[in-house]
A protein has these predicted regions:
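Amphipathic N-proximal alpha-helical interface segments
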Residues: 74-88, 102-192, 209-268
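Predominantly the structural core of cysteine protease catalytic domains
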Residues: 329-426, 430-434
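Short coil-to-beta-strand transition motifs
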Residues: 20-28, 194, 417-428
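Active-site-adjacent structural segments surrounding the nucleophilic cysteine of cysteine proteases
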Residues: 77-93, 99-100, 107-109, 213, ...
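Second-shell loop/turn segments in exported
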Residues: 50, 181-190, 283-294, 304-305, ...
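Noncatalytic regulatory segments and standalone regulatory/sensor domains
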Residues: 242-258, 262-281, 400-426, 430-472
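Compositionally biased alpha-helical segments
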Residues: 12-87
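Bacterial N-terminal signal peptides
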Residues: 1-8
């Protein structure tokens, strides 16, 4: 294959090399693009710039053109294996994430001041024909940095949460289970891993192995490198098959991420608090993660909170750490215990609190600081009906008192009946209004559920009176 020959040849340097100018001066750089007689280079200080090809010696010009031609052919091989126009001469971390999202038809999931994300669930809406590297990804998630450049692409194939799941999405996921068995999951995972390995090996060449990730998420992975891109394949028995695509520099770091200072995080959190004249106080700038058609509310919600606090996280890895059951269902206590050391290593402090009764004062201090509060509750259909109706009504509020009276009449009927059972769930409390006696809640079910307002009495009816949060 062309790509294999390219990588085997010293004529093509995937990383930095010395280039000779027309007057004898040299520069160490990496070729990242060519447009006619203009090339794009990345220097060792990681800055990119454009320069006329004529600034180089004639033999160097010929070498650069040959490099560009061979790299373009290699990129075509990888894109054929991908099934989409994914790579070019510019490594992913130098490209706009929105461009990659468009190429892969991934809808935007979240946008914050410190990064954005896009996510596609291929199995939704009859999208089973979607393939990446020959296999169907259940989840394709793209993450950007604050400047909109690609941070990494995370593709999850057969896994214990999505494979065989009979659950719906959002409010409809409760009561769902899985048709998968240990045997059928293992068979699907092995098939996906084999297909992906063969596709990447044919396009790029033989892989290497390395240890990757931090603490409980540390694992042995298979790695392919091409021109500043690293393709990292994880195959964790009984858990998931995943492919992460990132820069070779990030891969060389073994998946470790930098620690952001507590001062910076506190400033970021405080800047995200909004206050309205009607008394609403709520937190913005929290990433959204859609848990999809499975019971991953705990790992999805923890991912959102951890990322808001500057700690990189992925719900599929958190599901493994938290020993989530097939199809979903995670012990909050187990996940807290298992993820605490990682959170502390980044300078953050996990905290839990058991309360006698949920009140606005239970969360007010944290909300004022910009810290989302994770709340364990029963997400009953009656509660969701009230949350949806109240949120819609208050958006066009002309008579707040009448609206709340109508809501509380529904709540009084519920409170006089049996206590809620089942539909165990965790979401976030992200706001309050002391004047109206309402809480703002955020579920990990996509944009529609990012901010809903519920009367405190409705929240009290479904509350299990356990709160969790992470402090800077």
């Amino acid at each position: 294959m062309i790509a294999v020959l390219v990588l085997a040849s010293n004529a093509i340097a995937a990383e930095m090399r010395v280039m000779r100018g027309s007057t004898g001066e040299t520069i160490r750089a990496r070729l990242e693009g060519i447009d006619g007689d203009t090339i794009t280079l990345r220097r060792e200080d990681w800055k990119t710039f454009e320069i006329p090809l004529t600034r180089f010696a004639p033999d160097e010009q010929a070498r650069i053109r040959a490099d560009a031609e061979a790299l373009t052919a290699a990129a075509a091989e990888i894109n054929e294996a991908t099934g989409h126009e994914l790579v070019n001469l510019t490594p992913l971390d130098g490209r706009e994430a929105a461009e990659i999202a468009e190429a892969l038809a991934i809808p935007q999931e979240s946008a914050t001041s410190h990064g954005s994300s896009w996510r596609r669930y291929a199995a939704r809406g009859g999208g089973n024909a979607f393939r990446l590297f020959g296999a169907m990804p259940y989840s394709t998630a793209l993450y950007s940095d604050a400047d909109g450049l690609v941070a990494h692409l995370s593709i999850v194939y057969a896994n214990k949460g999505d494979f065989g799941s009979t659950a719906g999405s959002g409010e409809a996921h409760f009561g769902g289970g899985t048709s998968a068995t240990r045997s059928t999951l293992a068979e699907a995972m092995n098939a996906d891993a084999k297909t992906i390995t063969e596709a990447l090996t044919e396009a790029i060449g033989e892989p290497t192995t390395q240890r990757f990730g931090e603490r409980q998420a540390r694992r042995t992975v298979t790695r392919w490198d091409w021109h500043g891109h690293s393709f990292i394949l994880s195959h964790e028995d009984g858990e998931y098959v995943g492919l992460a695509i990132m820069s070779t520099e990030a891969a060389d770091g073994g998946g470790r991420t930098d620690r952001i200072s507590n001062t910076e995080i506190r400033e970021r959190l405080a800047a995200g608090v909004r206050r309205a004249e009607n008394g609403d106080v709520w937190i913005t700038d929290i990433p959204m993660v859609d848990q999809g058609p499975k019971g991953y509310c705990v790992p999805a919600t923890f991912e959102r909170v951890m990322r808001a606090l500057g700690v990189e996280a992925d719900m599929y890895l958190l599901a493994m750490i938290g020993e989530t059951q097939a199809g979903g269902g995670t012990s909050v206590r187990r996940l807290i215990d298992n993820v605490s050391s990682h959170v502390r290593s980044k300078g953050r402090r996990p905290h839990e609190e058991t309360i006698r009764q949920l009140r606005i004062r239970s969360v007010k201090r944290r909300i004022d600081e910009g810290i989302p509060v994770m709340w364990v509750m029963h997400s009953m259909p009656e509660y969701n009906k009230i949350a949806n109706e109240n949120t819609t009504a208050r958006a066009q509020d002309t008579d707040t008192e009448a609206r709340l009276k109508a809501m509380r009449e529904q709540i009084d009927k519920l409170a006089s009946g049996p206590e809620p059972v089942g539909n165990n769930h965790i979401c976030m409390i992200v706001g309050y209004n002391e004047k109206t006696g309402e809480l703002a809640v955020s579920d990990s079910w996509g944009a529609r559920y990012e901010l809903r307002w519920v009367p405190i009495e409705a929240a009290q009816w479904v509350s299990r009176d356990e709160l969790f949060y992470i402090l800077p």
